């Protein structure tokens, strides 16, 4: 009976280990899902403001050529007011998809908040940034010419690390945001 009891004890121990392993795996999956939700914009599927802030909080000096671009959708308030918030949401999703389709997978594309988006292009130069922005504009025009009622229009500003002696992503972000705001004001003046 002692051998039988220890065999039963072993079986119970094995079952306990299996149950604990399954529970740990479920918990790890749930934690990963919670982390994804914490850093992912539910509407667009892009990294959200928290993910953007986490990248910006890295205060390391940038060692390889990096660019930061800030986009702000134009007329989102007008679309929300005249066509409804669901139309505004569709415009945001459409623009997010456009950004993700144009910018290389290696680069960061996030929704900073509301109608603002942030892109970080790694290992780049000015010529590549210009080329990507030109491609974005062409793709935007194609989308807008398909007869879609929701026309994409945006202001953007960008900064690149090679223009600064020592830069962090936060420095690039602040400069890009400032240039974006200047471009937005210039567009408003031209449209008056």
Residue locations for each model-derived region?
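PAS and PAS-like sensory/regulatory domains
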Residues: 150-155
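A short pre-motif secondary-structure segment
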Residues: 108-111
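Active-site-proximal alpha-helical element of nucleotidyl cyclase-like catalytic domains
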Residues: 87-106
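Membrane-interface helix-start motif
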Residues: 1-6
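Short helix/loop segment flanking the catalytic signature motif in cyclic-nucleotide metabolism enzymes
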Residues: 91, 118-136
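Juxtamembrane or sensor-core-proximal signal-transducing alpha helices
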Residues: 10-35
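Catalytic-core segments of nucleotide cyclases and related cyclic-nucleotide turnover enzymes
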Residues: 81, 85, 130-137, 141-147, ...
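Conserved nucleotide-binding and Mg2+-coordinating catalytic segments in signaling enzymes
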Residues: 32-54, 71-85, 93
